[in-house]
Structures are given as C-alpha cells and as structure tokens.
Amino acid sequence: MSETLTRVYLFIGPPGSGKGTLSNLLVREYGWAQLSTGNLCRKHISEQTEIGKQIDLAIKSGKLVSDSLVNAMVEQWFAEVVNQTSNIILDGYPRTVVQAQAFDAFLTKLPTPVDLWVIRFGISDQAVIERIAGRLMCQNKECQKVYSAIGQSHLAPKSPMICDACGSVLGRRNDDAGALISERLSAYHKHEQDLIDFYKKQNYRIIEINVEMPFDAVFTHFRELMRLREV
C-alpha cells in the first residue's frame, strides 16, 4: 500500500455531462486511475473472463447486469489498482444505492482507509440532450475516445470523422439516439438523489460543480477545488 492516503473521486452526473472527458484529462495530466464500468464490462467480455461471460449472457438475454456482478467486477479492479496510485476516479459507479452500500462495505475492509469525495456534475437535461446529439466516439474498441461533431467544441476532431489518437473512423453510439437519451436520463434521475442522500448520511464530502461552463473553465474550477498543481 502506498504511504499516502488514496483519494477516491466518485463522479455523479447524467450521461453527456462530461464525466468521461474530465476523467480522461485527469488521467493524462496527473496519472490518475479511472474506472469506467462500461469500458470495464467491454474488456471482460472481449477477454472472455468468467465475469465477462456472465455479463455477455445477461446482455444477450436482454437482462440488466446484476448489482452483484457489477460489484464483483469493480471490487476486483479496485483491489488491483489501489496500491498503484493515490487518486482513483469512479465514473459510472455506483449507479444505485445497493451498489453504493456494497462498495462502501468493501472499502471498510481494505487494509488502509481511503478518502472518498463525491463530485456532483450540475447540468440541465436540455444541455445534456444538446451535447449527446453532437457526440461522436472512436469505433476502435481499444480506443473509444469521445469527440464532438460541433466544430467550435474543444472536443472536435482535427480531421472530420477521424480519431486523433488512433486514426480510426468515428461514429455515434447506438444509445445516443434521441428516444434512448430520454430513457437514460430518466433512469439516471431515478437513482441520483437517492445516491446523494446515501452519501450525505455517511458524512462524505459532496461537491457540486457547474459543468455547463466551457470545459477549460470546468477543469480549472475542479483543479482549484481539489488544490491540484497546474500542469
């Protein structure tokens, strides 16, 4: 275990709020570890691990991946990286109070305590819908970098529909279709306040940041709140 206390940042925000964008920048600039449950699920499926086989079966059967399976996957990942970094971002986990309770219990069993911060991304549904409508993703499963089709955006690719990082073609995510966006927002709001209430009762730090600002301003504000050095 590292000598310094590991700080865990739990990003809570709707799809399209910029959690992944901020996470990726913090990984690149500061070397933090990032957990994206979506990417981790895809990794387990592609590697045909035991967890991956169960996730794949659930998805192909049209079922939701169970909380117990998600928890097992996350706990395995966390146990592997907690000794390697002082800062860990949780992006997309926990999504429900059941998952939060399980993860909280898991943290209490670690040899050394961690410092958990809850970061709530403040953004309107309308702003989310506009962002997702212009979202592009690298189609290379090993990359999956996110871009924006809006030319003035800081996320616009240098070459139209081509990934800056790996040169693969960009496309839209299947779940970014208009009707599905509304469904995903509804699902998010169903659990959001319950999660916040849970962490308040546990006396964790909860910080809200306005992510409707330009991304550079969001990053600067986050860096100031966390007292991070400028890089």
PLM segments and residue spans:
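Glycine-rich phosphate-binding loop of ATP-dependent small-molecule kinases
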Residues: 1-231
